[in-house]
Amino acid sequence: MSVIAAQREWELAEVAQEVGAEVVCGSSLKANLDRDWDQTTQKEEALSLVLATLTQVESWLGSLPHAEQHPKAQQYLEVARQVKAQDVEKEQEGKATLIKGVAKERRISVEDGQMRHGRKSRSVRVDGDIRHVLHDMDSGMVRAVGVTAANAPEASVTETISADLERQAVTLQELHIDRAYLSSHWVRTRSPELEVYCKAWRVRQGKQFSKQEFHLDWERQIICCPAKLEMPFTPGGVVHFPKKSCAQCPLQAQCTTSPKGRSVSIHPDEALVVELRQRQLTQAGRAQLRERVAVEHTLAHIGHWQGERARYRGLRKNLCDLRRCAVIHNLHVLARSEPFLQAA
């Protein structure tokens, strides 16, 4: 309505009165509704009023003459429809209620259509975008950066970062990453020369034998259980030991309580997972993992300069802003470098 009001050179309140949508005028919609939000009935009344107002605005826009039709007005109306579709459902009685849970690809910002919900872990939620930084362990410089929506897999950013590295004619020799990037194309399609340093996934330690008690023979593609029963395996598959053998096994109580027998999942890149797990058991391996602290420091520095709130709307503009902060970081690193200090 504000678009049409500006086009007519009217006040928003005048247009709202014509439409019958006075509730949208004022400092905020929530203030105009003025409900006790702890009361279920009042929340339902407020939702019904908002939906009725949206219907009135849709009808009013459709009745406007062609000369007054404006692309932006239709664009804003589509945003409202999207929010309604993802957050509101009708019960059997026909009453509108807010959907419990979060819709897939849920839009979280009216202004920025690319922002999404995401999770770093079960307890840590991220709203908006996630920044990614490629830190050069030798020079301390940031070689490339990336931005993804919060609900996108973090590993998906590596394709665009690789394109930036190609323009710099840079080849990766070592990857010091966290576990979110283990599914990236860098790891999946790595050459034998590329070393990957990452903490391995934790092995569940219950009352029964853990996966580490099973021996993997990579030459024969055979897995051997603690009772010396052998079964073939394939990366990415699940090995099911025969239930009859498990039922007769003297170690059954220590291995499984399932009447179907013991099963073991094999990671698609199980060889790498085993290598990472064995490496972090050694003092030298743990020291190599600690080298990644420099990456976390770089992320903290850039986060300090850029802030935790996106300055712009859209991934492209926020990527540009992240690159700006990476340049500032690199200038600080350069200013602390020995050649620069000697020249000074």
Region roles according to the model:
Residues 1-344:
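Anion-binding and metal-coordination hotspots
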